[in-house]
């Protein structure tokens, strides 16, 4: 089959991306740095039937989207995020499920000199199995070691690389010698496009419990502010009523003014012992009962002693 010319290929690509944008209401803008062709093929296979992965040149993707803005103006929100090595993952399924599938397709990778670290790298305390001739190599990296049974032992965990730092040649060599693959590469979700709205992928981690907690925090903040400035709202009115009742009660206690609910408080302040008089009665009644038990056991002890005195032993 003859290979299609470049003009035909571009035309088909534009038609494909426009059709995907029309057919799928949701998509991820994903970064594809350090993702090889074999890994990309595995990702496509794992998403088959649930999502479609589309990669391409940024200029072509922008051109296709700009040409389709008349039919779907909301697509303009995607344009600022098409930069770097990015692509799209289109889906009609639950976004969290597709996100988890992308994360599951990350593969471990060794550290390479010159690469930017996507995460912190810590070398754990361990016996490296390396000979003493490598001691100077560890010292150059500031790693405390000792010789144990003819091999180098790292005494404590060491943070070797920080997120965003460039991996040096020495760090990469050490990690390779220790057979540590600190990084994992795959499609990284940069933005989420959902029915015309675009937002950060961290929003996918928000649960109903999180929303409920944040809502209650907001209600408490509103109530606090409204109470301070004296502005009544649904959130602050219950607190205002309680505070008002406390003030009226305080006035009633200090004056001759009274009302049914205040009378009980006044009675308590006048004679607090009247409200706790029943408590000692329980203790007092319980004490004689406890004392009566030994009294009943006393005759039994006397009878046992008398049996022994009479000589009725066990072997008689």
UniProtKB/Swiss-Prot annotation:
Subunit description: P0 forms a pentameric complex by interaction with dimers of P1 and P2.
Family statement drawn from the similarity comment of this UniProt entry: Belongs to the universal ribosomal protein uL10 family.
Listed transmembrane segments: none
Family annotation (InterPro entries): Ribosomal_protein_uL10, Ribosomal_uL10, Ribosomal_uL10-like_insert, Ribosomal_uL10-like_insert_sf, Ribosomal_uL10-like_sf, uL10_eukaryotes
GO molecular function, one term: large ribosomal subunit rRNA binding
Location, primary (coarse class): nucleus
GO cellular component, one term: cytosolic large ribosomal subunit
Compartments it resides in: Nucleus; Cytoplasm
Alphabetical keyword list: Cytoplasm, Nucleus, Phosphoprotein, Ribonucleoprotein, Ribosomal protein
Function as written in the Swiss-Prot or TrEMBL entry: Ribosomal protein P0 is the functional equivalent of E.coli protein L10.
Species the sequence originates in: Gallus gallus
Post-translational note: Phosphorylated.
This protein's record includes keyword Ribonucleoprotein: yes
GO biological process, one term: cytoplasmic translation
Name this polypeptide is given: Large ribosomal subunit protein uL10
UniProt superkingdom: Eukaryota
Region ranges (Disordered): 289-316
